[in-house]
C-alpha cells in the first residue's frame, strides 16, 4: 500500500496539479462526522415527493422550461468537469500500477484534486434530488427507479465517503461520466434542440454498463480481499453488491420496457 500511496502523491505532482479553487479548505472531517444526516435528507425527500404529488394532483402542471434548461446545463458542466479530473487520475493509476491499486486501496482520498471533487460529488447527490421536483411540478410520470436511485445513491455516497470505501473512486468516476452525457441530453431536450434518436438508449446502456462494471469491481475486491491484499470489509462488499445488483435489475427492466417491448412507451427516467 505504501507504494500505491507514494505513487499517488507523485501522480498529483506530475499530472494533477490543483487549480487554486481546488485547494479549498478540506471539509471531510465535517462531512464524515455528520454523514448520518443523509438519512434525514432522504426521509425529507421521500415525504416531499408524497406532499408534492398530492399538491399537484388537482393543479395544472408548470412549464419550467427555462429553469430546467439552466438546471440541466449546470449539472452537465459540473459532471463534465468532474469526469475530466477523475478519469485522468483513475486511468493513470490503473495503467501505471494496475487495476488492483484502484479497487483495493483508497488512494484517491490522498490526492488534493480528487479530494476536492469527491467532496463536490457528495454534495451533488443532494442537489440532484431537485430533479424530482421538476418531474412532480411538470406532472411527469415518476417511476420507481428514479426516486430509488436518487435516494440510495446519496446514502451509499455518504457511507463510502465516511468509510473511504476503496472502490469508491470508480463509483464516483463512472457516475460522473454517465451524468455528463445524461444531463447534456436533458439540457438539449429541455431546450428542444435536435439530438440523436438513439441517445436515450445509449444513456440507459451506459447506466447498465456502469452497474456491470461496479459489480465486477466488487467481485474483484472480494477475491483480492481473500488474499489479504485489499483494504475493504465484508460490509463494504455487501452494500456495494446489493446496490449495484438492484440498479442493474431496475435499469435493465427499464431498458426492456422503453426500447425493446414492441408496444407502449415508458417515460424518460428523469424528464
From Swiss-Prot:
UniProt keyword terms in alphabetical order: Endoplasmic reticulum, Fatty acid biosynthesis, Fatty acid metabolism, Glycoprotein, Lipid biosynthesis, Lipid metabolism, Membrane, Transferase, Transmembrane, Transmembrane helix
Root EC class: transferase
Subcellular location: Endoplasmic reticulum membrane
Pathway(s) annotated for this protein in UniProt: Lipid metabolism; polyunsaturated fatty acid biosynthesis
HAMAP family per the UniProt record, alphabetical: VLCF_elongase_3
Transmembrane regions listed in the UniProt entry: 30-50, 67-87, 116-136, 141-161, 165-187, 199-219, 236-256
Species, as recorded: Mus musculus (Mouse)
Molecular function GO terms recorded: fatty acid elongase activity
InterPro entries (alphabetical): ELO_CS, ELO_fam, ELOVL3
Record-level GO cellular component terms: endoplasmic reticulum; endoplasmic reticulum membrane
Swiss-Prot/TrEMBL induction comment: Strongly up-regulated in brown adipose tissue in conditions of brown fat recruitment, such as cold stress, perinatal development and after diet-induced thermogenesis. A synergistic action of both catecholamines and glucocorticoids is required for the induction.
Source species taxonomy: Eukaryota, Metazoa, Chordata, Craniata, Vertebrata
Record GO biological process: fatty acid elongation, monounsaturated fatty acid; fatty acid elongation, polyunsaturated fatty acid; fatty acid elongation, saturated fatty acid; long-chain fatty-acyl-CoA biosynthetic process; positive regulation of cold-induced thermogenesis; unsaturated fatty acid biosynthetic process; very long-chain fatty acid biosynthetic process
Annotated knockout phenotype: Mutant mice grow normally and are fertile. They display a sparse hair coat, a hyperplastic pilosebaceous system and their hair lipid content is disturbed with exceptionally high levels of eicosenoic acid (20:1). In the triglyceride fraction, fatty acids longer than 20 carbon atoms are almost undetectable. As a result, mice exhibited a severe defect in water repulsion and increased trans-epidermal water loss. When exposed to cold stress, mutants exhibit a significantly reduced VLCFA elongation activity in brown adipose tissue, but only during the initial phase.
E.C. numbers: 2.3.1.199
Post-translational modification: N-Glycosylated.
Glycosylation sites noted in the Swiss-Prot or TrEMBL record: 6
Name by which UniProt lists this protein: Very long chain fatty acid elongase 3
UniProt subunit comment: Interacts with TECR.
Catalysed reaction equations from the record: a very-long-chain acyl-CoA + malonyl-CoA + H(+) = a very-long-chain 3-oxoacyl-CoA + CO2 + CoA; eicosanoyl-CoA + malonyl-CoA + H(+) = 3-oxodocosanoyl-CoA + CO2 + CoA; hexadecanoyl-CoA + malonyl-CoA + H(+) = 3-oxooctadecanoyl-CoA + CO2 + CoA; octadecanoyl-CoA + malonyl-CoA + H(+) = 3-oxoeicosanoyl-CoA + CO2 + CoA
Family recorded in the similarity comment: Belongs to the ELO family. ELOVL3 subfamily.
Membrane topology designation: Multi-pass membrane protein
Tissue spec. comment: Expressed in brown adipose tissue and liver. In the skin, strong expressed in the cells of the inner layer of the outer root sheath of the hair follicles and in the sebocytes of the sebaceous glands. Hardly detectable in the epidermis and not at all in fibroblasts.
Function text: Catalyzes the first and rate-limiting reaction of the four reactions that constitute the long-chain fatty acids elongation cycle. This endoplasmic reticulum-bound enzymatic process allows the addition of 2 carbons to the chain of long- and very long-chain fatty acids (VLCFAs) per cycle. Condensing enzyme that exhibits activity toward saturated and unsaturated acyl-CoA substrates with higher activity toward C18 acyl-CoAs, especially C18:0 acyl-CoAs.
